[in-house]
């Protein structure tokens, strides 16, 4: 390029001697500035660069860090890699151990190994993610999911995720990739299997409900038996008390009459009731005899 500028300056009419010299100096300065610009490049933060040489190819021993660097123009070309971790979601349909179709999705956080960038460029180029991640993720998912039944994939999800991460990390090392995180984001089954699981859950709930009703009926039956035994015992004790003290019935009549009289006295509609209506007939000789016997019994 500088030689072309010099040739162009030589073809220009000489004219006044001072003007030709100034023009040549201007063109020379432009050529020098262009050469300096082509000799300098910058590696941004979170990036690394390697050199491709027109003579020797990729330089295996040169990995450039962030900052300003120099190169030989027209012979060395910098190839810049972004080494920051980037997320990628990959979905894959696969089969479980009990031959159920499973749709599983992973979120993979990956980055290139900065120390192996020259060999990565020779094998995979710059689009290494598209070349590597989908294939190794599908491979590992099919291998791991096939070890578990469909129900185990749900109940042992943490163990499945750990196994997928371990195998996928080891597999990615073969391609100079580092996986910072692997997580299961979605796990679904076919409609038929989902319907079967829901039906099974409904049946289990119905069975549990039926068992609960049976236990409830048994408890109610035991309660009635205990209540009947208590009432029978109370009746027996009452019979013994009456046989020993007949005045107990008279006392109950007096208390009942007192309650009735109090209720009528506080009511707005007052009526006249005889002693017979109050179950308190003081003229009844049997009542008097019962009361006397009750008083004697207390003494």
Swiss-Prot record:
Predominant subcellular localization, coarse grouping: mitochondrion
Modified sites of kind N-acetylalanine: 2
Gene Ontology cellular-component terms listed: cell surface; cytoplasm; inner mitochondrial membrane protein complex; mitochondrial inner membrane; mitochondrial prohibitin complex; mitochondrion; nuclear matrix; nucleus
Keywords attached to this entry: Acetylation, Cell membrane, Coiled coil, Cytoplasm, Membrane, Mitochondrion, Mitochondrion inner membrane, Nucleus, Phosphoprotein, Receptor, Repressor, Transcription, Transcription regulation
PTM entry text: Phosphorylated. Tyrosine phosphorylation is indirectly stimulated by IGFBP6.
Transmembrane region(s): none
Coiled-coil portions: 190-238
Keyword Cell membrane listed: yes
Sequence positions bearing Phosphotyrosine: 128
GO molecular function: protein homodimerization activity; sphingolipid binding
Protein role: Protein with pleiotropic attributes mediated in a cell-compartment- and tissue-specific manner, which include the plasma membrane-associated cell signaling functions, mitochondrial chaperone, and transcriptional co-regulator of transcription factors and sex steroid hormones in the nucleus.
Subunit structure: The mitochondrial prohibitin complex consists of two subunits (PHB1 and PHB2), assembled into a membrane-associated ring-shaped supercomplex of approximately 1 mDa. Interacts with ESR1, HDAC1 and HDAC5. Interacts with ZNF703. Interacts with STOML2. Interacts with ARFGEF3. Interacts with SPHK2. Interacts with COX4I1; the interaction associates PHB2 with COX. Interacts with MAP1LC3B (membrane-bound form LC3-II); the interaction is direct and upon mitochondrial depolarization and proteasome-dependent outer membrane rupture. Interacts with IGFBP6 (via C-terminal domain). Interacts with CLPB.
Protein family membership: Belongs to the prohibitin family.
Stated name of the protein: Prohibitin-2
């Amino acid at each position: 390029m500088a030689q072309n500028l010099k040739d162009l300056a030589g073809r220009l009419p000489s004219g006044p001697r001072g003007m030709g010299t100034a023009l040549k100096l201007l063109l020379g300065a432009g050529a020098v500035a262009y050469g300096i610009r082509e000799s300098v490049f910058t590696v941004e933060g979170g990036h690394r660069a390697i050199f491709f040489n027109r003579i020797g190819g990729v330089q295996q021993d040169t990995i450039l860090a962030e900052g300003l660097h120099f190169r030989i123009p027209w012979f060395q070309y910098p190839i810049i890699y972004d080494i920051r971790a980037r997320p990628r979601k990959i979905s894959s349909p696969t089969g479980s151990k009990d031959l159920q179709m499973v749709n599983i999705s992973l979120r993979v956080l990956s980055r290139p190994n900065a120390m192996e960038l020259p060999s990565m460029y020779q094998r995979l180029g710059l689009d290494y993610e598209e070349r590597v991640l989908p294939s190794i993720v599908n491979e590992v998912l099919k291998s791991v999911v096939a070890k578990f039944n469909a129900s185990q994939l749900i109940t042992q999800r943490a163990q499945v995720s750990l196994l997928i991460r371990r195998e996928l990390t080891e597999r990615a090392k073969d391609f100079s990739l580092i996986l910072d995180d692997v997580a299961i984001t979605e796990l679904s089954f076919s409609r038929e299997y989902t319907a079967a699981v829901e039906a099974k859950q409904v049946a289990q709930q119905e069975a549990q409900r039926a068992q609960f009703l049976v236990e409830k009926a048994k408890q109610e039956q035991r309660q009635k038996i205990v209540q009947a035994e208590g009432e029978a015992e109370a009746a027996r004790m009452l019979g013994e008390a009456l046989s020993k003290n007949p005045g107990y019935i008279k006392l109950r009549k007096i208390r009942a009459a007192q309650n009735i009289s109090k209720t009528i006295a506080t009511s707005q509609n007052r009526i006249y009731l005889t002693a017979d209506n109050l179950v308190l007939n003081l003229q009844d000789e049997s009542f008097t005899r019962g009361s006397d016997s009750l008083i004697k019994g207390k003494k």
